[in-house]
Each structure stands twice: as C-alpha cells, then as structure tokens.
A protein has these predicted regions:
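Flexible, acidic/histidine-containing loops and adjacent segments that form or flank the divalent-metal
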Residues: 2-5, 81-214
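Conserved beta-strand hairpin/beta-sheet module of binuclear metal-dependent hydrolase folds
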Residues: 2-66, 202-214
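Short acidic, S/G/P-rich loop/turn micro-motifs used as interaction or catalytic elements
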Residues: 40-43, 78, 171
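Active-site-proximal beta-strand/loop segments in catalytic clefts of secreted hydrolases
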Residues: 23, 36-39, 74-76, 148-151, ...
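Metallo-beta-lactamase
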Residues: 68-79
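Soluble catalytic regions of membrane-associated enzymes that act on cell-envelope
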Residues: 64, 74, 95
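Short, well-ordered alpha-helical microsegments
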Residues: 17, 80-81
C-alpha cells in the first residue's frame, strides 16, 4: 500500500500512458488505481528497445499495479487509446470515463473493410475500431461507462478530486454528430475525406482534467 499519491508516466513511445495510485482503504490492496490513456498497440512503436519503451499492458504485467479501478480515454487516437484494449484484457477496470455518450459505441458498425489511403488514416480507423471493441468488452464485463462534461467535480478517493475542464457539451455534441456522419457514409471517397478531417480535429475534443490532491 502506498503512503502517498504516486504518479507514473509509462514510456510507451510517442503516445501517452499514465498510472495514478492513491492510498485509500476502501479499494483493493488499500490503493485506488487510475489509468489515463494506454499508448499505442503498434508493434513497430516498440522495436527500439534501447529507449526503454514498452507496451502499456507489458508494463502492467511486469510492474503492476494488479488492478485498475478507473480507466480514462482522453480521446480516440491510436497512440492514446489502442494500448488500453490489451490493458483492459489484463485488468478489467471498474469504471471507464470518456467523452462520447456511454452508449454511443453500441451503434457503431465494425468498420472492417473500410478504405484508407495513408498510414495516418489507417491508424485513426484502427483507433475507432478499438474504441468500439473496448467499450463492448468493458460493458460485457460489468464496467461502468461514464461520459464526462466540463464543469463536473468528482471525488476519486481520499484527498483526490478531479475537475473536468473540457470538453464542453457543445464540443461533445459536435464530435458525436461528425462521427455519426462518418460512420453512416457509404461512398468510399467521402468516407476517407471525413475520416481525415475528423482525425485532424480529434485533439480538440480531448478530455482535460485537473487533479487536486491534499
């Protein structure tokens, strides 16, 4: 059991993956464990072992922690989201926070076989597929899916408070509208155009959190 809050930034290469552990006797092992993003799932991202980078799930398997109370996806990009899928298969989180409506994934098609022309388009399409797969898997295992909105203040554990700074409801509605337009598009050229445009804007819809620990 940790005696104070511990924040770990895992070397997953270009993307992001963070683990926050906070002492609280109400949780397993006396620690509340929160994961924010999971880095990439591309094997090529980890070929350079000299840098010390490794897949997020491998880090969890080797160094722990042995459970996840809360998993957060800041936005749907390959180098932030796709590493969460194997991490969740290793340790299913009790709760999952993200920006889309908690049931949006259920209406998403598989997206298998949709066309791409560039590596960037392929990465974004895989991120969308993995988001869908992740949410389906989490829901099937009883994880509580929650949508965050700017202005919320949430107590996470003893002494730790989370303030949601972004996105605003207007931004989330815009994201869902544009994503629905993309998913419903049948013409290949128009699909690729919408895919590229949404990929370029996705960072604008990211979760922004301020954590306060006392």
């Amino acid at each position: 059991m940790n005696q104070t809050m511990k924040l770990t930034f895992v070397n997953v290469g270009y993307g992001e993956a963070m683990i926050l552990e906070c002492p609280d006797p109400r949780y397993r092992g006396g620690n509340f464990v929160m994961v924010i993003d999971g880095g990439s799932a591309e094997p090529g991202e980890f070929e350079d072992s000299v840098s010390g980078r490794l897949p997020f799930s491998e880090y969890l398997r080797t160094y722990g922690p042995d459970h996840i109370d809360l998993m957060i996806c800041t936005h749907i990009h390959e180098d932030h989201l796709c590493g969460l899928l194997p991490a969740a298969e290793l340790n299913t989180p009790s709760a999952f926070w993200q920006t889309l409506s908690s049931d949006f994934y259920a209406s998403m098609p598989p997206l298998d076989g949709r066309p791409v022309k560039t590596a960037s388009q392929d990465k974004f399409l895989r991120a969308l597929r993995d988001y869908r797969s992740l949410c389906h898997s989490l829901a099937a295992h009883g994880t509580v899916l929650r949508t965050l909105r700017a202005g919320e203040i949430i107590s996470l554990c003893e002494g730790l408070t989370c303030r949601v700074l972004a996105p605003a409801a207007l931004r989330t509605d815009e994201l869902q509208r544009d994503l629905r337009s993309l998913l419903d598009e049948q013409a290949d050229d128009a699909f690729i155009e919408k895919l590229t445009a949404l990929d370029a804007r996705m960072n604008n819809y990211s979760l922004m959190l301020m954590l306060e620990y006392q």
